[in-house]
Amino acid sequence: MATEEPIVAVETVPEPIVTEPTTITEPEVPEKEEPKAEVEKTKKAKGSKPKKASKPRNPASHPTYEEMIKDAIVSLKEKNGSSQYAIAKFIEEKQKQLPANFKKLLLQNLKKNVASGKLIKVKGSFKLSAAAKKPAVAKPKAKTAAKAKSVKAKPAAKPKAKAVVKPKVASKAKAVAAKPKKAAAKPKTVAAKTKPTAAKPKAVVKPKSKVKPAKVAKTSVKTTPGKKVAAVKKVAAKKVPVKSVKAKSVKSPVKKVSVKRGGRK
């Protein structure tokens, strides 16, 4: 017979669970992004404050140093150029409101203009270069041209109101011009009147000239006809220019007729 072994209940003791310390790792990306956003905000806040506090610059109480230097050199008119001391003295006398470091700034601008070729340095004195002299002469011309244009533009606006008056003056001038024409027309009528008077003596001369040769022809029949006919022709030839001459020439043939009558007696 098989013997049955008693079943012994074995108790299992649970093993202790060793728990390792867990390190919580926070994501690095959000940690970095948050400080950047904060830095940008702080920068913007700092940048906005000086802008609000910035004041507009006061306009300079004097022209640029380049203009002042050119003005000093041109007005001093020194052959060998003007020294720094002479230029500074001239500018100080002309410009009253200058900064405390004026002489230092003047020296810097002199060196700058020499380097750019606008000024020429000769033994410690400064001259204007040929390129710098030309614009200095051209600028006043441009200003005068602009002034002349503005002066011409102003009178151009005024004639609009006087435009109504001008036609009246023109009409008066036309009327005055028309009067001399009428006066010129009158001499023509006078000339026309004188022409008929000149024509009257011609009409008077013609009948006399016709009568005279008839009388002479009678005498020519009695004596030698050949010679007297020639004489009559000469008289007729003389009478042709008498027509163009004035009335005084008409008296001469009357005297000849009287002489011929005496011959008949």
UniProtKB/Swiss-Prot annotation:
Gene Ontology BP term (one): chromosome condensation
InterPro entries: H1/H5 (IPR005819), Histone_H1/H5_H15 (IPR005818), WH-like_DNA-bd_sf (IPR036388), WH_DNA-bd_sf (IPR036390)
Alphabetized UniProt keyword annotations: Chromosome, DNA-binding, Nucleus
Comp. bias (Low complexity): 1-27, 186-202, 216-226
Taxonomy, superkingdom: Eukaryota
One annotated Gene Ontology cellular component of this protein: nucleosome
Region (Disordered): 1-66, 131-226, 242-265
Membrane-spanning intervals of the chain: none
MF terms in GO: double-stranded DNA binding; methyltransferase activity; nucleosomal DNA binding; structural constituent of chromatin
Limits of the H15 domain: 61-130
PANTHER family named among the record's database cross-references: HISTONE H1 (PTHR11467:SF143)
Protein purpose: Histones H1 are necessary for the condensation of nucleosome chains into higher-order structures.
Name of the protein this chain belongs to: Histone H1
Record organism: Pisum sativum (Garden pea)
